[in-house]
């Protein structure tokens, strides 16, 4: 669980600028931070604790996990945009933002995460 918490925090930190900068004109900073936390709480535990048990093939797992995160987070952002009537934000913008955020956290997280997991393992 400690490893997951470190990787969850890393994911949030990596996605922070990707979500907050484009949403800044329509969303106050504190609400942006809350949104970021909510998005990751909606997807990250499922990606880490549920989906790996469903797939033996690592490639299939990663593809499904990333698609799941992009779609769910995009739907949440798009739903909020529609509910709050953000004129410049539609479903396509929300999905694009979700894709970009998850691509950053998956790519950079893949590189850094293995090093962190190894480092955390040394502390045990």
Task: Identify the residue ranges that each predicted region occupies.
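Hydrophobic transmembrane alpha-helical segments in integral membrane proteins
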Residues: 1-14, 121
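N-terminal signal-anchor/start-transfer transmembrane helix
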Residues: 8-24, 73
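Membrane-interface helix-boundary motifs at transmembrane edges
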Residues: 23-34, 82-90
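A generic, lipid-embedded transmembrane alpha helix
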Residues: 35-54
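Hydrophobic alpha-helical membrane segments
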Residues: 43-44, 62-81
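Non-cytosolic membrane-interface motifs at loop->transmembrane helix junctions
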Residues: 58-66, 123-124
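Membrane-helix boundary connector in multi-pass membrane proteins
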Residues: 75-97
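Juxtamembrane boundary at the C-terminal end of a transmembrane helix
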Residues: 106-124
């Amino acid at each position: 669980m400690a490893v997951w918490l470190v990787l969850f925090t890393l994911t949030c930190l990596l996605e922070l600028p990707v979500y907050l900068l484009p949403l800044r004109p329509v969303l106050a900073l504190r609400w942006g931070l809350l949104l970021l936390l909510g998005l990751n709480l909606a997807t990250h535990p499922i990606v880490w604790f549920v989906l790996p048990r469903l797939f033996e093939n690592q490639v299939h797992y990663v593809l499904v996990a990333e698609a799941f995160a992009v779609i769910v987070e995009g739907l949440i952002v798009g739903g909020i945009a529609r509910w709050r009537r953000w004129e410049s934000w539609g479903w396509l913008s929300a999905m694009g933002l979700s894709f970009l955020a998850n691509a950053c956290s998956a790519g950079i997280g893949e590189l850094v995460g293995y090093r962190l997991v190894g480092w955390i393992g040394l502390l045990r």
